[in-house]
From Swiss-Prot:
Coiled coil, from the record: none
Protein name: ATP synthase subunit c
GO molecular function: lipid binding; proton-transporting ATP synthase activity, rotational mechanism
Membrane-crossing residue ranges in chain numbering: 36-56, 81-101
Gene Ontology CC: plasma membrane; proton-transporting ATP synthase complex; proton-transporting two-sector ATPase complex, proton-transporting domain
Keyword terms: ATP synthesis, Cell inner membrane, Cell membrane, CF(0), Hydrogen ion transport, Ion transport, Lipid-binding, Membrane, Transmembrane, Transmembrane helix, Transport
Site (Reversibly protonated during proton transport): E89
Topology versus the membrane: Multi-pass membrane protein
Entry similarity comment: Belongs to the ATPase C chain family.
Function: F(1)F(0) ATP synthase produces ATP from ADP in the presence of a proton or sodium gradient. F-type ATPases consist of two structural domains, F(1) containing the extramembraneous catalytic core and F(0) containing the membrane proton channel, linked together by a central stalk and a peripheral stalk. During catalysis, ATP synthesis in the catalytic domain of F(1) is coupled via a rotary mechanism of the central stalk subunits to proton translocation.
Length: 112
């Protein structure tokens, strides 16, 4: 896994560090940057959604278990659960915003 990660970072470093004046080469570099941007956006959003789903599931399970043990605390636990779910969902939305920036407002793409 470390070798694959090192290879991916090395390829990304070459794509980002290369500087040229030839329009054909610059277009090829832009294609690589776009490809890596799509890969990063997809992986980042997928990991964020997976983590958010696991966190939301654990939060709901803990709230249901707490309400089953002490039904009088149900409304208070629900309020706390909704606040926690909003915070978890905010992290996924932040990942979505970063993915959209990487896809549509990429600062590494050189316009000609």
């Amino acid at each position: 896994m470390k070798k694959f990660l090192f290879l991916l970072l090395a390829c990304a470093a070459v794509a980002f560090a290369a500087e040229t004046n030839a329009p054909v080469e610059q277009e090829a570099i832009n294609v690589w940057i776009k490809a890596f941007s799509v890969l990063a956006a997809g992986l980042g959003l997928g990991v964020a959604a997976l983590g958010g789903a696991i966190g939301m599931g654990n939060t709901a399970a803990a709230t249901i278990a707490g309400t089953a043990r002490n039904p009088g605390l149900g409304p208070k636990l629900m309020t706390t659960m909704f606040i926690a779910l909003a915070m978890i969902e905010a992290q996924v939305i932040y990942a979505l915003v970063i993915a959209l920036i990487a896809l549509y407002a990429n600062p590494f793409i050189v316009l000609q």
